[in-house]
Amino acid sequence: MTTLNQAHCEACRADAPQVSDEELPVLLKQIPDWNIEVRDGVMQLEKVFLFKNFKFALAFTNAMGEISEAEGHHPGLLTEWGKVTVTWWSHSIKGLHRNDFIMAARTDEVAKDAEGRK
């Protein structure tokens, strides 16, 4: 079985199924420390990454941009002094798709190698 951080995103159309109630806890176990947030009725994955300063936070944001472009799936990114909040959800289905969990796992991989982490 391919782990989430090794998987690739698939095209997600408006008729793609959201992650089921049965799949959700299984997938969440593979991305510890990510939180479920619900905004405007839309379930999202969110995690805050801490850095020593703005420069390191911005570098992480740019690294996230690179992997997001490569996979064709893009997060919400809030870059602040010493902190980046990453939020994943699938806009087309207004909820969570397996792609969001794949990208959350990939985000954790990028964060492991990010310079200036707290």
Swiss-Prot record:
Gene Ontology process terms (BP): tetrahydrobiopterin biosynthetic process
Principal EC category: lyase
Catalytic activity: (4aS,6R)-4a-hydroxy-L-erythro-5,6,7,8-tetrahydrobiopterin = (6R)-L-erythro-6,7-dihydrobiopterin + H2O
Keyword Transferase: no
Keywords per UniProt: Lyase
MF (Gene Ontology): 4-alpha-hydroxytetrahydrobiopterin dehydratase activity
Alphabetized InterPro entries for the sequence: PCD_sf, Pterin-4-alpha-carb_dehyd, Pterin_deHydtase
This protein's record includes keyword Ribonucleoprotein: no
E.C. designation(s): 4.2.1.96
HAMAP family found in the cross-reference section: Pterin_4_alpha
Similarity comment: Belongs to the pterin-4-alpha-carbinolamine dehydratase family.
Protein known as: Putative pterin-4-alpha-carbinolamine dehydratase
Species of provenance: Pseudomonas fluorescens (strain SBW25)
